[in-house]
Amino acid sequence: MSYYNKRNQEPLPKEDVSTWECTKEDCNGWTRKNFASSDTPLCPLCGSKMVDGIRSLVNLQNNSQTKTS
């Protein structure tokens, strides 16, 4: 068996990504805007409204064809 060491890999670059963040104070729900299912999503954890936000994350591309703009 081989042992693969991932510690030698460089970390992926982070950048500011637009997100939707839950407005409920005790909920940590959030989602990337390009992965949201609607233009005004509800929190998937508690069902509250979500507002615009920005987080420093690794950039991911959404290749899904389900959302059309």
Swiss-Prot record:
InterPro entries documented for this protein: YdjO (IPR025916)
Pfam families: YdjO (PF14169)
Domain of life: Bacteria
Quaternary assembly: Interacts with the RNA polymerase core.
Protein name: Uncharacterized protein YdjO
Originating species: Bacillus subtilis (strain 168)
